[in-house]
Amino acid sequence: MASAEIIAVGTELLLGQIVNSNAAFISQELAADGIYVYHHTVVGDNPTRLKEVIEIAEKRSDILIFTGGLGPTEDDITKQILADHLQKQLVEDEYHMNKINEYFASRNRTMTENNKLQAVIIKDSVVLNNDYGFAAGMYLKENNHTYVLLPGPPSEMKPMFTKYANPLLLSENGNQNILESKIMRFFGIGESQLAADLNDLIVNQVNPTIATYAGDNEVVVRITATAKTKEEASSLVKDTEEEILRRDGTFLYGYGEVSLPELVTAMLLEKELTISAAESFTAGLFQAEIARFPGISKIFKGGMVTYSEETKQSILQVSPQVIKEKGVVSAECAKEMAENVSRLCKTDIGISFTGVAGPDSLEGHPAGTIWIGLSVKGHETEAFQFVYGRDRNHNRRRAVKQGFQLIKQFLDAN
């Protein structure tokens, strides 16, 4: 089985100015191909150190995948150093050169000479077209190694890898069996707890394999099976999926790449249920999230951010008595906020968020104490309490996702 190493080139990565998300993406894709990634390497824009990294990687990996260093500036050195190492010439790729010329001509701008560097490739390499930029990618086999050169910006790298590089890698190095994969998404359970629940499956895994990943306030489980036929592979995945659901199915919210907010929004659109939101400590995060999706104007009528007691009373019409006797961090306040925003915006559903974002306490409640109110036409209004940690922004984001989960649970049950 072929082994791969991902080499990210860029001093900005070493300085922590940019997160190396490219390596995570490529590793996940290669895992699905049956190509094992054993090393991630990050090296700055230094010719000597990059050459050292290449020499080390060749001793331990069959496939070397580079990201970054293909641009027009002096510190973009990846292809120059690799070409020198392989004793290969650099030549101009006509397609990318024409693309660069046409770009500047169409804007009536003079092209600087260094822009031509983006169209330069290592001789004898397969050119990987850049559909979203100018820097050409490369795929090259030499001395029993495969070299893949990809641009650094994820918006250029991901489509180039998916459309051009990965099919070549898969055809030449991938698992010859049929590979089937399924992604399960969980909310409301931590990665450590989920991993503990599935520990015997993970420890004894052979085929399928199970991997857990911590996402943004969620946990992702990836099941991957290989077999001679698609039917066999699918059956292996299904058996494992059913066992996982038996243990932790109550926390599952969906499959694949669809996020919880996206899934809930689609459900609301399908059911043609309108929604509004009243937010205190989340300060509009829920509304900003739901507004990201196309067609949302059909169901999202609006909302209110009422951060202070005064605006809760004057704008959202929360009872002064409730605030005085129960406080803003209470089930009663959350219920009134949800009911009133639904009434004022004339929607089927009203959701509210009130609580203590942190790090300080409020009204005697510790940081991370939150209430979410849910008012649905024809149903009794409910309020749900959750207690998180002291991280202010983490609490706000988690509460928003929790709100979407509560809506999903209602829609699933009704």
Swiss-Prot record:
One short Pfam name that applies is CinA
Which InterPro entries does the record match to this protein? Answer: CinA (IPR050101), CinA-like_C (IPR036653), CinA_C (IPR008136), CinA_KH (IPR041424), Competence-induced_CinA (IPR008135), MoaB/Mog-like_dom_sf (IPR036425), MoaB/Mog_dom (IPR001453)
Q: Which CDD domains match?
A: cinA
Q: Which domain of life is it from?
A: Bacteria
Q: Which family does it belong to?
A: Belongs to the CinA family.
Cited HAMAP family: CinA_B
**Name assigned to this protein:** Putative competence-damage inducible protein
Higher taxonomy: Bacteria, Bacillati, Bacillota, Bacilli, Bacillales
